[in-house]
Design a protein with these regions (language model features):
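C-terminal non-catalytic regions of proteins with extracellular/luminal or membrane-system context
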Residues: 1-302
């Protein structure tokens, strides 16, 4: 049987406490007024029908109405949420004073500016597979941790693209009417690691030939935590304009309550410079957070 966020919520709360509405007019005004929480599931789809026609390149053609909005052969000139979902959310917000929790089920980066502005909480579910609805309900009802990180860069405006975390030039202040075109950056979201503190970060280029060893101490609070910590690097020097940031390593950790643990990142030098670059300076940050930064110098005999 197919699962959905609605079915998972019904299984936990009971059918009498969960009302399903495909559009705002499906529920009477008094029901919207009585709601304690509104869960707005939005996003896109890559679903193809079994009788799809295929293009010359072998990709299934998307149907015009409610067909695939992402996937192979589905390039879009407008990456706002399809099917007027922003307008629908505006109608919902006008009908209720209850907090809105938006769940974005997306297979590509969409402009979620209106969604974030109108929602008390926004959960990026991506394409989470058959257990995705269960995971969302675990968060909404059971208070499960959200340990994931945003796997894409979300643009703030439909025309201020492309935006990529590892570009060589910043997208900020390129457009006069969109000073900050990035809504949420790649890797955004501390999730279940929000209460973890880091200290004693340092880099070692000597003990492991051919790689940079970055070490940091993690300290969990009274509840413990589990999730991935990402290490980003920015390289100065060399023959090319450097990328603003590169994801160079990721370490999953599972900390007990009150536990302190040393975490080690191993970054091959080949990922940080090209042949003939000479001496370069590498600045590493945890999850792009400038408060946790360390700098190392790679010698020039490469």
């Amino acid at each position: 049987e197919q699962s959905s966020v609605y079915r998972q919520l019904v299984a936990r709360l009971g059918e009498d406490r969960v009302l399903l509405a495909a559009k705002p007019s499906d529920a009477p005004a008094d029901q919207w007024a009585r709601a304690s929480t509104v869960v707005f599931v939005c996003g896109s789809t890559s679903e193809r029908s079994y009788d799809s026609e295929f293009d010359d390149n072998g990709a299934a053609k998307a149907v015009t109405e409610y067909g695939a909005t992402c996937g192979e052969g589905v390039d879009l000139s407008d990456i706002r949420l399809p099917w007027s979902q922003d307008d629908m959310l505006g109608e919902v917000a006008a009908l209720t004073t209850a907090p809105i929790v938006s769940v974005a089920v997306c297979g590509r980066a969409h402009v979620l500016t209106d969604v974030l502005e109108r929602s008390a909480v926004t959960i990026w579910a991506g394409y989470a597979g058959q257990y995705g609805p269960q995971a969302v309900a675990d968060v909404l009802v059971d208070g499960a941790d959200m340990s994931g990180r945003l796997p894409v860069t979300l643009p703030a405006y439909p025309a201020a693209i492309p935006v990529r975390y590892n570009d060589r030039q910043s997208a900020a202040h390129v457009y006069k009417d969109a000073a900050e075109p990035i809504l949420r950056g790649f890797g955004y979201g501390a999730g279940s690691l929000a209460a973890v503190t880091f200290s004693e970060m340092h880099a070692d280029t000597q003990s492991h030939p051919g790689e940079v060893l970055v070490q940091v101490t993690a300290h969990a609070d009274d509840h413990g935590a589990a999730g991935a910590v990402n290490l980003f690097a920015h390289v100065s020097g060399g023959r090319r304009i450097p990328r603003l940031a590169m994801l160079v390593d990721s370490v999953y950790m599972d900390l007990n309550a009150g536990e302190r643990r040393d975490i080690a990142f191993h970054v091959p030098c080949d990922r940080l410079r090209d042949v003939g670059d000479g001496q370069v300076q590498v600045t590493c940050t945890l999850d792009g957070d400038s408060t946790h930064t360390v700098t190392a110098t790679l010698p020039g005999e490469y």
